[in-house]
Every structure is written in structure tokens, then in C-alpha cells.
């Protein structure tokens, strides 16, 4: 927390490559009557609309890999890298690690912003170590402002991303915890982010309750609603079942904020309905019926679980299917339940088909180097790219 308190925007002048240079592309609004997937008529008389928003929480092997650096990785190891290829389904991307403050690498921000995807960093405090950080979180400055709300908003503005996932998985120390004070902090953080970052958001994670206990509610309840009320959304824990989900829907509807609930699914299973993996469709089906948004935690499962083998095929099957009969299959991909978002602008779409990694480096048709190279960002126009 001391390092966070001492941070200043001018500190990154010598690290300009770590700052995003791409503003968030504004996606065109959806048509008034969005086309619906052909859901089975036996489910409901009139199918509900697709899941409104999908959050992808990028928890991948601890984060901050060489291939994610601004300069990429060159020469690169022979195995493929994890990339996010189905951005037309994603509304918000969270870069997650177990550091206190996780700032998304600039290549991720640039790539996602080009496709209209909002990018959030993560502020996380965990276990007994987290209580030490929480002892200072609500510190105020000389003018009564919350010091760390100001700092987090400035970091988002400086690095060019769009806000924060606030994940408090520890109790505040002592007996003086007051939920109203944490609410005031979150309200100020939300206001500061909105002022400094156009379209910025703060999303609360379902862990800490108003009783100062880490007690995952697996939905919206009276114990976490006060924190949801002062943020832009809530990412629920993954252990819910349909009765809890329906109760969440009813409570969120009373607040007129159903789409602001991001019902969580752990892609590795770990208590999620459907068991994660290709079974996420079972959880998404329940979310689809309830009408909330959804959040996928660790979709890098498509790479990690298979050690990168046949990654593109596995990832495609997870997100959009393998081209077979989706209606007749018990295993349905993410795209079956989620509304597609436009990629590109309302009047343009541009691609050079450069995926940012390949078997060598070519410039003007001439081989410059044959070792593999990796970067999550497609090459800029002045670099002809990978093949």
C-alpha cells in the first residue's frame, strides 16, 4: 500500500511502452430487434433475449507473461500462446493476478480497445496479508478525499484502461469497520474513475459482506447489496444454483439493475453448475433464463487444461462450437447464449489478418528472422509482421 500511495503519473515516463495508445472504440448500438438464437421452443413459450453482457476474467497462469510485454517475445518458444479470439462475444475483460494491483499490459488494452471491449484492472486483497492492506485502504488526505480512490483512478487514466474489479477477500482489522465508510470509498472511486476515464467502471466482487466477513453469497443478498448499490456492477461467486440465481434476479430487478449482475462461472469447475470446461453451457443456460449478465473466470482453461494441445480447435469449440448441430447437442458453446457485439465501427471494419504470432518475421516479403515471435497485439502498420 505504501508503493501505491507514493505512485505518481510522472513515474511512468520512462516506461511509455506500458501505456495504452488506443482509446476504447465505441461499438454501434444493437438493432432494436436483435436476432435470437433458435432456442428450443420446449424451454419457454417465448425465448428470452440473449445474455446481455459477458465479462471475461483473464486468470491465466499467474499473469504477466513474456508474450504479453509491449515488445512481445522474440525469439519465442515453439508452443503456441493463449490469445482471446472471440471478442465479439465479450463486453468487459478483466486482467487478473494475485498481486495487490494488477495493471493490464498495454498490448491487451490496445487489442481489446480496437474491438470495443472495456478493460479493467484488479485490486485484490486476500487472507491475513490482505488485512494489512485494508488497514490503510480508507485513509483520507488533507482535503478529506480517499487517497487510494484517487490513486486507483489516476492509474487507470494514466495507463489507459477503463476501471477496476474490486476483490476484497479479507476482513478489515479491528472492531471499527463500518460498511458505510467502505460504501463512501467505493462511491468516490466510481466517481473518480467516471470523471477521468470515459465509460469507466468499478465492479464489486462477491466476497466481503457488510458484517466484515468473507462469506461468498453466490448472488445478490442483503449482505452485499450495499456495495453493489454504489458500484457499476457485481461479479458473483461461482457456487450458485438456480434458486439462488432466481433470488438474485428478483432482488436486482427491484433495484432496476438486472444486467449489472455478472453471474460468475469458473471455467475450471470448482463448484460451478455444469462443472466448467465444455459444461459452461449448463450454467449459461440458467443465467440466460434468469436474464442477468455473465462472467467467465479463467477461460484460459481451453489452453491450460490441455497444455496448449490443439488450442485453436479447443478454444473454438468452447466459444462458438465445432460447426456441428448445436441445437441437437447437449454441449452448447458460449455463443449460443450471449448476444454478439459489433467489432469495428458503425462505418468500417479493418483487419490485416495478422494474429500477432507466427513462425517467423518478414518485412516487405523478405525473411528477417525465422525464430517464432509472440505478442498479443497485431503488428503496427510500419512492421509488416509475422507469417
Language-model segment annotations:
Residues 3-6, 10-11, 68, 79, ...:
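Glutamate identity and glutamate-enriched acidic tracts
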Residues 45-246:
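Chitinase-like catalytic core of GlcNAc-active glycosidases
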Residues 1-107, 111-114, 118, 138-149, ...:
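Non-catalytic accessory regions flanking glycosidase/transglycosidase catalytic cores in CAZymes
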